[in-house]
Amino acid sequence: MTPLEKQLTEQNQQLVETIARLTQTIEAQNRRIEELLERLNKNSRNSSKPPSSDGYQKPKPKSLRESSGRKAGGQDGHEGHHLSMEQTPKEVISHMPGGCAGCPLYEECRGKACVAETRKVADATIEIHVTAHETLTVTCPLTGKNLRGSFPKDVKGPIQYGKKLQGLIVAFNTVGAVSANRIKEIFGSVFGIPLSTGTVSSMVCGFAEGLNGVMADIREQVIDSPVSHFDETGIRVDSKLHWAHVASNDSFTYLYLSGKRGHAGMEEGAVLPYFHGIGIHDCWKSYWKYDIMHGVCCAHLLRELQGVTENHPEQLWPRHFSALLLEMKKRKEAAMSTGQDCLEPDILADISDRYDAFIRLAYEENPEPVKVPGKRGKPKRGKLLALIDRLRDYKASVCLFAENFVVPFDNNQAERDLRMVKVKTKVSGCFRTKSGADGFLKIMSYIGTARKQGVNPFTAVLLALAGEPKACWAE
């Protein structure tokens, strides 16, 4: 080999190595750009992010629901609701024709006038009702002793707030998510009652403490339920991240606070360790540690699949998979309308075959990453392959809603039960103390349960203040 040939060979080898390094760098940068674009494109419609994280630039509405073919608004046969005209008025004001004013026969005509039309105005009268309790002393004519009456147990001081005012304050602060300072302003201006923020906090905390026994009963009801929903959401408490966990069904709501999101937080709630029914959740890995029957929230899967479709429009499998899930849901609803409790075996077999076929297509469109020579460790597989793995590994739990009609399609029940927690933190930003967060979750557990039993929140609060919180539901 001549010196020139040797030089050209060395240069060629150097170029090959340089191109290989550049190719690896470009591939790594492309992966990083793809990850950043996916993160940038995430919103509440194509991921598990809450709507509050969308900011002012809301994505265009693109519902996953299909058109029902029905016109918008109330449907034929729908029972409407309006302000009733049947209420008995406490005051009647009659209006004579304007031209009769000043007529000498005005009073005579007024006595003969007939009612042409009645219109009613419903308004509220705001007044403070003060009840004075006094003890009486008498001298017994039989014994000669001086006897004195006693105050009711709930009348403890020279002056105090009544139960309706306490109930209103608790309802404002929890159900209404009104801050203590705003409550102080409202009660001062509307009722003329002086309140301090400390008094508001004290009332709410005292009310929560009285619910300890009820919380134990609600927890037992959720544990004994054949199907329960589980979820969690992050909240700031005393400048630290905590987690509000929920375990609920269509009749009871159990909320509790924990410093942990995963298995430790679930153990702290003492629901899942004793639960033996079907647990519906969002596929968070910690739930799979419990030896129960699991149902996966398909609404979460649809949002994730929507995200894949938007970020990787060239891939076909997410569209097919979304269509399959929605078809299963539609078939279930049609079967339930005819009184069935599961889909026919041949339909389930066809669904299973197509499910497996779409999983195979997903792996074909997303091959395993190739290990780079000289680079330590396994190559990073990415979130897309992780989603496909989940759909493959938990197929039985994803399809459970079609095999057992007791199992719902989604985990909306748990998400609805957590919604007021997010509303409260959106208004207040955070909870200053752990006891305050604990108290709020107890109260919302009780009120959420009362709502499911058909009892309005204010009535439920008054029942609890009267010492009868369990009156909200039948034993």
Tell where the protein language model's regions lie, with residue ranges.
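Catalytic center-proximal scaffold of phosphoryl-transfer enzymes
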Residues: 6, 13, 27-28, 136-139, ...
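Short, flexible loop/hinge motifs at secondary-structure junctions
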Residues: 1-160, 201, 230
